Amino acid sequence: MFKGLSKGSQGKGSPKGSPAKGSPKGSPNKHNRAATQELALLISRMQANADQVERDILETQKKLQQDRQNGEQNQALQHQQETGRNLKEAEVLLKDLFLDVDKARRLKHPQAEEIEKDIKQLHERVTQECSEYRALYEKMVLPPDVGPRVDWARVLEQKQNLVREGHYGPGMAELEQQVAEHNILQREIEAYGQQLRTLVGPDANTIRNQYRELLKAASWRRQSLGSLYTHLQGCTKQLSALADQQGRILQQDWSDLMPDPAGVRREYEHFKQHELLAQERSINQLEDDADRMVELGHPAIGPIQVHQEALKMEWQNFLNLCICQESQLQRVEDYRRFQEEADSVSQTLAKLSSNLDTKYGFGTGDSSGSPTELLLQLEAEEKQLAIAERAVGDLQQRSQEVAPLPQRRNPSKQPLHVDSICDWDSGEVQLLRGERYTLKDNADPYTWLVQGPGGETKSAPAACLCIPAPDPEAVAKASRLATELQTLKQKLSTEKNRLKAAAVEHLQPGQQAPAGSAPADPQGQTLLSQMTQLDGDLGQIERQVLSWARSPLSQSSSLKDLEGRIHSCEGTAQRLQSLGAEKEAAQQECEAFLSTKPTGSAALQLPVVLNSVKNRYNDVQSLCHLYGEKAKAALGLEKQIQEADRVIQGFEAALALEGPVPEGSGALQERVSELQRQRKELLQQQACVLGLHRQLKATEHACSALQNNFQEFCQDLPRQQRQVRALTDRYHAVGDQLDLREKIVQDASLTYQQLRNSRDNLSSWLEQLPHHRVQPSDGPSQISYKLQAQKRLIQEILGREQDQATVSRLTRDLQEALQDYELQADTYRCSLEPALAVSAPKRLRVISLQESIQAQEKNLAKAYTEVAAAEQQQLRQLEFAKKMLRKKELDEDIQAIHSARQGSGSPAHARTAESEVLKTQLEEERKRVAEVQRDLEEQRQRLLQLRTQQPVARLEEKEVVEFYRDPQLESNLSQAASRVEEEGKRRARLQAELEAVAQKVVHLEGKRKTMQPHLLTKEVTQIERDPGLDSQVTQLHSEMQRLRGENGVLTARLEELKDELLALEQKEMNVKEKVVVKEVVKVEKDLEMVKAAQTLRLQIEEDAARRKGAKETVAKIQARIKDLEQAISSVEPKVIVKEVKKVEQDPGLLKEASRLRSLLEEEKNNNVALARELQELQEKYRVVEKQKPKVQLQERVSEIFQVLPETEQEIRRLRAQLQETGSKKSGVEQEVEKLLPELEVLRAQKPVVEYKEVTQEVVRHEKNPEVLREIDRLKAQLNELVNTNGRSQEQLIRLQGERDEWKRERSKVETKMVSKEVVRHEKDPVLEKEAERLRQEVREAVQRRRATEDAVYELQNKLLLLERRRPEEQIVVQEVVVTQKDPKLREEHSRLSRSLDEEVGRRRQLELEVRQLGARVEEEEARLSFEEDRSKKLAAERELRQLTLKIQELEKRPPALQEKIIMEEVVKLEKDPDLERSTEALRRELDQEKNRVTELHRECQGLQVQVDLLQKTKSQEKTIYKEVIRVEKDPVLEGERARVWEILNRERAARKGREEDVRSLQERIDRAEALRRSWSREEAELQRARDQASQDCGRLQRQLRELEQQKQQKARQLQEEGRLLSQKTESERQKAAQRSQAVTQLEAAILQEKDKIYEKERTLRDLHTKVSREELNQETQTRETNLSTKICILEPETGNDMSPYEAYKRGVIDRGQYLQLQELECDWEEVTTSSPCGEESVLLDRKSGKQYSIEAALRCRRISKEEYHRYKDGRLPISEFALLVAGETKPSSSLSIGSIISKSPVCSPGPQSTGFFSPGLSFGLTEDSFPIAGIYDTTTDNKCSIKAAVAKNMLDPITGQKLLEAQAATGGIVDLLSRERYSVHKAVERGLIENTSTQRLLNAQKAFTGIEDPVTRKRLSVGEAIQKGWMPQESVLPHLLVQHLTGGLIDPKRTGRIPVPQAVLCGMISEDLGQLLQDESGYEKDLTDPITKERLSYKEAMGRCRKDPLSGLLLLPAMLEGYRCYRAASPTLPRSCVR
């Protein structure tokens, strides 16, 4: 109905500019979403009401026409009542429409004006119908002399009383009713105006004046109601929102059973950071509006004040509840944290107690191990107990602070004291913060009954009250834990004493054991005890140092704790030195003792103990040294952190305590200087932050050394890193805050200076005004002169009104700037102290400087108004004096006439004439006074309206005024145009110069993005003007807007340059003079500087090109301005003057001209400032250019170095040696630890038994078989290590290949795919060369970057030095060279692009051919192998049967006969080929069996190795015992064993070294890739892609040739074997007898070998059983493969990798990009579980915790085998494969087609209706089904889309187009993955269809959406369009046929499908068309079968389709061309062979 809705509305009445749901603009604010929903509902309701009014009008017209005909035929009028009812209903609906349109205007609907026009048209039509109704039904027959009379005075007085007595509010419901009533009254009053214009009579003027006053009063009341409604609506919304928020807080359970405290905390923090300030600004705005309305005397002061007080009270209560919420949340979190830690400590104590009872219990029989081992384990238990003791002490201290939360929900048996957390005032109940009450009843969890200090009882909200600490349960729990701890400590000390005694008893037999066998050696025993003592001391020192390294620092006093540890570490180091001296002395004694070759147990143990002591001493010394370095670095870092925190806190405190700007002329400048001083001090403290980062790097280096050597992680490092990052962020935040405040104050200072100048000029002008007072002696001429002068003065005063407006505008701008300054300060203060924004009282929003400025502006405005009024009064006095003089002259003339007549008339007649003259003069004076009063009242009312006018107000003017061209205004406009042209030229020059300087400075720091100017769209009310002047003003306005935008860009650029220069000035110099002098002498030319100079030259050329473009733009603007001037001069104003009736000056043009003047002045000032800044920059840069760069050129070159490849190799070799030494050391330590228990066991054994066993073994066995087996096992293990080394080499090759691939694919934001699986690849020499070239490029890039950094640093230092010298200004003239793009280079680029596309196409074609040929080769090989195996098997079986028959015949025949006949014939005459083949087969079988036996033997050896390893790990003591005894027996075998172990250790060390090399290589690859991303070129990428394509093509061709050669070679081999077999047939027949005997022997050998195999298999089964028994105690083996997707962002300045969060915090990306990258990050982990049932692989998303089974995905066909193999081969990324396995797809963001197209009923079965059509009837509707959705590939057993099938030549393009048109005609293009349907445009965007077929698909889509009738503007279905002739039947028939076949026809006005018979009955289609659709024999066969190539109809195609079991979609079978040809050639082959 509405025109506004039909012009570009976006569906269902949503406003054009309103953001859609879920858009970034609409989502952050709930109020915007609510307003959008309310507006949509409002528009839909207005649409329905307007449609109903339209129907009522049409029906009324019809009824009136019928009754009018009845009246003409003298018949009765039949429709009077029905017509009256329709008109009444229409009037009621119009009333609602007028109310709704006001709401739409307040909600800022963009088309509200057009909607209101439509409603007015409806109202006029209803009014016309009402007049026709009255004319027809209410005819009154009046006498001829009596006409219609209306008492207009009484009617207008009644309306005036209604307007005057109208109420305001007090609520929203009453106010809405009042607005509706006044709108009706306003329309009635406006309707009176049409009749009063034609009113004639004596009282016509009085009635018109009365009507005019009534109209003004009604307009005033309407504006008052509108402003009141807007204000009360905002207050109501805020009150409801505050009530909801208060209710959520009050209804929360704050006891220990509170659900999800973490979620409540997150929600509260989010509200505090993002919504609190916005809500406070909204409430402050409402309060300001209320204050302004009360100040201006709004008639509804009462409701406004009531709502204002309610809003203030609710806001204060809400802030108090926020305090309560934060306090209650803190109590709940403390309580839960205490309970969790107490439970953890309790579990720890229980576990320790259980260990003491089970492991160390005396007499229980469960304790295992020697007492020494148990003592060592007990020491670990003591450490855990010490940690638990500290935790219990902490819990006891915190138990006194935990609040008793359970008492909040439990009814109290005795009165409890509760404290009030905040102030609360609900009217009935008042609470004071900190006051204590007595709890009487807490049965209601949300409202408690408390008793105050005075004895009064009140019901208070429970959220505002808290029960004070401590919690009795928490105290009891802490005490109980302390008791358990003491008990456990006593038990542990008891067990420790018992174990020590047992250890002493256990050692005594071992000390006496050697006495029986050998004499004791006292020197050996002494040395052994001394070395044992040293080992114990070293172990104690090691444990002490490790305890320092593992325990974190104290949080409260970290410095003291760290200093104490360093002091203790120094003491430990001194003690270690003394132990080292003792160790050296003891070592010399031991070596001297061992050189005498002593005997005895001490001599045997002494070498081992000595080696152990030496190794431990080295380890402890290294550990102590590393920890000392780490502790010193950490101490320096802690001191630096405290120093930086102190410095930053000082700046933050200064910024937080900064007060408002004081009153005074120089206050702003003082504030600017203060901020600059603080910024300089901040830059001076930059060294503190840099030192902080240096200390952090030193600490990280020390911690990494400790971790790499001893695997000890530093517990304090993460905390220190977080503190450093936080301090850095705070430092940058302080700097940003200072810059922002300085910029705001500087802008405010400039505005304040302009304000002072304007105010002073206006004040001085007001003081110097002339006074034209009337003097008694003035005559008529003097009065006339003063009157003319006074009029000129009045005109000048009116002209000065613009200056007064400028002062007001500047005052407003300055106040806004100062308010922004305060807002920024408050925001920063709240960020420092989060509770300040809630707890602090609301401060005054107007500071002292604002008050003074506002007072001065008010005084100035008052003085101006008084002067204007006084001068107006003076003008009236002069006019009155002139009239009085004229009257006096008239009286004198009259008197002269009377005296001259001499009695010609009577005196009475003279008096009568005189009285008539006086009466006429009196009437004239009265009229003038009334007119002046009326004008004054109009001005007063207008002034009041302007003051109370809302920002968005509608201006209605009924009077149309024609304007003429003012010559003065035209001259002013021409002058303004010329000045604009001059300013444009000056700006162009300044811009070119500024850009040149900016480019030269910017290239030192890098390119920055320029800020694009924002487009400012301003909606203005259109006024009819002269077209020529209007176009000129529009053009000038656009030019000024463009210049202002450019000025903003230049100002921003200038500010950036100033900041950079200031930062460069503050940096300190760090010049190394010696290095400079030496390197200046040596270096003559620097290649990097040459490159930098070339780059600078290129940038200068680019700047010249930009300058040329700017000049061309200026020339265009000048030509445009000249054209405008010519157009202005060509206009003839004389013609326009003739048409003008009312000559006035256009106030809009006057204001526009004055505004242009002010803008020009501002632009001049800005240009002056820019020129001054430009001169400064030029001076600075000129000084930099003059200074020769040789002094500082090589300042940091000495620091730039590159490690030589030989050095890197040496470092790697040393690192490998170091790791090998470490591995040897660890192996020796493990051996020593294994041998020590054995020594004690040997000591405890009886010497006789040991001696006899040794003697027997030495005598009887020279070589022990077990030792030999052990040697064989170790050799096998050595072979296994060699194989592992080979696999590592293969892994290295694979990683190198992946590195090269990553170098080609990685970009700015990279996705790292980390896989731990090993895939074997071969080295590619081409890729190796490419990698070397890339490394060289990376090194060159690093050198260029470092050289650039050096140049930047040098120029900064030069600039700093030259700035201090302050040289004189000079003008620099530079020659700029204009460059253009080379067309040859552009053609070469396009040619390379085309050639790359051709190469890609050829490569894909070759890949397709190779795949087809590969498949054919595999099929042929499979067929040949199958036939060969089958023929061999048949031949062997036939030979076996023949041999069996022959043997049976020989056995059955008599011996003589056999001897005479058979044997001779066989030997002499026959050669049996079958027997020969059988023999060969048996030989091959024998070889296979031998190989199998060998493999089984090898497997048996491997299993034996595993069994030995398991036995070794399970029972180490027994194994080591045997080895120790045999070591003593056979030193040869011991040497062999030592050698094998040495080889094993070397192999392990080598493997670790290779793994370290692989890791280092991977890291270098990552670093190289990170640097390469920023230096890659597009041409290099194209060239590499082309080379890769050619390489792949060559490789594929080579593979194809190799396959063909292999095939030919196999064929030749088969032929050669056949020929050789035929040649050997004759000779083999002669040896048949021998072969038969050999066969018998072979059969016997085979049986023997089978027996051996069976024996081996039995042994293997036993070993398997043993292995399975050993693995029973272990869990199922699980292999995990980490596959993570991590987003890295390259930092623009340093080139380092950053996470998305770091990039977002540093401002590199915005919040939207951060959220998008955060969603892309995932951490997939492939977990493969091996169990007896097999292996099972699942994908685990470590980020969300979800698991997805790969086997289940294969079974459910979410993935295919091809995709699985691609993933295993690394060709499918993990992210895509994980999404396929999980079955997740991206959700559809919108519906398929527009707002009027609903989804298919399959997807959304509920009925839907649109906002533009009535629902209609829904009878006879059926559900639809999907059309043919895709193609089923029979070759790969997969589905694909129609677009992909056409691209693969599986489907005819015409058939594909028909299938897509069928989808579009039945609801949209189908997406096979998501089963969603999309419109044609959406499908093009998603890539489902091609762009070439869009138009045909759009035509087909009309069958679903319908078309619009050009005449009636109604939506028609295609059947109706055919009947009306709007569409041809031939083009629509296929679409209707598809709809009929898929469920029925589609009517766009209804949901669901309609059968053809029902459509014929409804008139949707004709009967002929219905018969044509139902006749299946006449269906056109326009489709082609992809397999059989026969023509078929759409129904036949649907019959041949296969239905997808998952989605239910129809898929048309098809196959590839190559497979189709092969199947046609060999149709009898099975499917497996074909595939």
From Swiss-Prot:
Function description: Component of the cornified envelope of keratinocytes. May link the cornified envelope to desmosomes and intermediate filaments.
Coiled-coil annotated residue ranges, if any: 842-1664
The Spectrin repeat ranges on this chain: 229-330
Family matches, as Pfam families: Plectin, SH3_10, Spectrin_1st_PEPL
Region annotated Central fibrous rod domain, chain positions: 842-1674
Organism of derivation: Mus musculus
Region (Globular 1) residue spans: 1-841
Localization in the cell: Cell junction, Desmosome; Cornified envelope; Cytoplasm, Cytoskeleton
Ranges where the record places region Disordered: 1-37, 63-84, 400-419, 1607-1637
Biased composition (Basic and acidic residues): 1607-1631
Plectin repeats: 1186-1227, 1679-1714, 1819-1856, 1857-1894, 1895-1932, 1933-1970, 1971-2008
Name of the gene: Evpl
The protein's name: Envoplakin
Region (Globular 2): 1675-2035
SH3 domain span: 413-470
Biased composition, class Polar residues, residue ranges: 71-84
Taxonomic classification: Eukaryota, Metazoa, Chordata, Craniata, Vertebrata
Any single Gene Ontology cellular-component annotation: intermediate filament cytoskeleton
